[in-house]
Amino acid sequence: MRKNIFKTVLTLLARGISSTCLAYSNSDLNAVLNGASCPGGDLSGADLSGMDLSGRDFTNTDFTEARLDATKLDKAKLQDACFQSALLTRASLRGADLAHANFRYANASGSDFTNASLQGAYLNRCQLRDAHLLNANLQQVKAQEASMDGVQADYADFSFANLPYSWLRRASLKNAVFHGANLYSAHLERSDLTEADLRSSKLGHSNLNNSKLDKALLDKAVLEYADLRGAEMNYTQFGTAFLDNAKLDK
C-alpha cells in the first residue's frame, strides 16, 4: 500500500513538473494578444495559430511546443528564439531574423522562410517538408537528420552547413550554395541542383540518384561512394573532386 502511494505521488509530481516547464506566462501571452512584442518571453505551449505577429520582437523568446499553425511572423525578430517541438506548419516567416534559433524536433512543413536568415540555427530532426527557403540564409545551420523533402530553396545559402543524413529528395536547389557544407550520407534523389555551388562540400555516401547537376560546381568536393547513377551532369565542373568508388553508371 505504502509503495503504491509513493508511486502515485511521484507520478503527480512528474506531471506537475512537466506542465510547469511548458506553462506559458499569462502576462507574456496577454501582451502578445494585445499587439505587443515579447523579447525574452515565455510562450511555451501557447496556441498562437493563425495570428499575425509580423514585425514584432521575439528575440530569445521560448516557443517550446507552441502551436503556430498558419501564424504570420514576417520580418519578425526571432534571434535565439526556441521553437523546440513546436508546430509551425504553413507559418509565414518571410524575411524574419532567425539567427541561432532552435528548431530541434519542430514541424515547420509547408512554411515560408523566403529571404529569412537562419544563420547558425539548430534544425536537427526538424520537419521542413515542402517548405519555401528561397534566397534564405542557412549558413552554418546544424540540420542533422532534418527532413526537407520537396523544399523550394533556389538561391539559398547553405555554406558550411552541417546536414549529414538529411533528407532533401525532390528538392529545388537551383543556384543554391553548399560551399564547404557537410552532406555526408544525405538523400538528394531527384533533386534539382542546376548551377549549384558544391565546392569543397562533403558528399561521401550521399544519394544523388537521378538528380540534376547541370553546370554545378564540384571542385574539391568529396564524393566517395556517392550514388550518381542517372544524374544529369551536362557541363558539370568536377575540377579536382574526389570520386573514389562513386557510382556513375546508369
Where are these regions (language model features)?
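Bacterial N-terminal signal peptides that target proteins for export
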Residues: 1-9
